[in-house]
From Swiss-Prot:
Gene3D superfamilies: Thymidylate synthase/dCMP hydroxymethylase domain (3.30.572.10). The gene is thyA. Coiled coil: none annotated. The lineage of its organism: Bacteria, Pseudomonadati, Pseudomonadota, Alphaproteobacteria, Hyphomicrobiales. Keywords: Cytoplasm, Methyltransferase, Nucleotide biosynthesis, Transferase. This is Thymidylate synthase. Its EC number is 2.1.1.45. Homodimer.
Length: 264
């Protein structure tokens, strides 16, 4: 994906050295946008191998409203382990905000159910949004949301999605985020009777950690390959009805995995 390669090149050439919460240090740029036409293939990075199982199960976990890592562990996914407490809890992170945003009167809002229904009833609405950034809950979260706001847009029978990501770990996190939100767009399009349009990824602080620079340079020596195709079980019509077995990725022929340590 040349869009991702361009981002790596921009950070390596123009990035500012910054200190960060983890103490690792970063090269950072502010404000970057990538666009992916979902009709042109599924935007799964090919310049290194990504684990589809982890991407799919994490998204299904978010959609369940779950905030404990047991489901992930049950399916062999460990990407959230560094932030969980001794009981596996993460506090009111993504799933809680997506599915049960707390209201002042003690109730809750299911943002996912609401946005799917709104797309069906009023596809021209400019309010087709979901946010995970809840200032009242941020201090209770093991990790405040990095990908914090997304908006759907319907035109000419196609559903597009734009994600705003306040903090973007470009080497490790961003490839996951691209695939995850592209998949979410395909899923929402299917259950609302629309075709997939674009995934637009807007980044705030887009950074490479100082211990990922050599890996990024290695990745830039690799030519992107043809994108794979994601097929979804057409029988699923409920956004909460998807299972891992409903997704099939074909034609994924990436370069080998590149190891890098996560900054916690």
């Amino acid at each position: 994906m040349i869009q991702y390669q361009d981002l790596l090149e921009r950070i390596l050439s123009d990035g500012a050295e910054k200190h960060d919460r983890t103490g690792t240090g970063t090269l950072s740029v502010f404000g970057h946008q990538m666009r992916f036409d979902l009709a042109a293939g599924f935007p799964m990075l090919t310049t290194k191998r990504l684990p589809l199982k982890a991407i799919v199960h994490e998204l299904l976990w978010f959609l369940q409203g779950d905030t404990n890592i047991k489901y992930l562990h049950d399916h062999g996914v460990t990407i959230w382990d560094e932030w969980a407490d001794a009981n596996g809890d993460l506090g009111p992170v993504y799933g809680a905000q997506w599915r049960s945003w707390p209201t002042a009167d003690g109730g809750s809002i299911d943002q996912i159910a609401n946005v799917v229904e709104m797309i069906k009833r009023n596809p021209d609405s400019r309010r087709l949004m979901v946010t995970a950034w809840n200032p009242a809950d941020v201090e209770k979260m093991a990790l405040p949301p990095c990908h914090c706001l997304f908006q759907f847009y319907v035109a000419n029978g196609k559903l597009s999605c734009q994600l705003y990501q306040r903090s973007a770990d470009v080497f490790l996190g961003v490839p996951f985020n691209i695939a995850s939100y592209a998949l979410l767009t395909l899923m929402v399009a299917q259950v609302t009777g629309l075709k997939p349009g674009e995934f637009v990824h807007t980044l705030g602080d887009a950074h490479l950690y100082s211990n990922h620079l050599e890996q990024a340079r290695l990745q830039l020596t690799r030519a992107p390959r043809a994108l794979p195709v994601m097929t979804i079980n057409p029988a699923v019509k409920d956004i909460f009805g998807f299972r891992y077995e409903d997704f099939t990725l074909t034609g994924y022929d990436p370069h080998p995995h590149i190891k890098a340590e996560v900054a916690v």
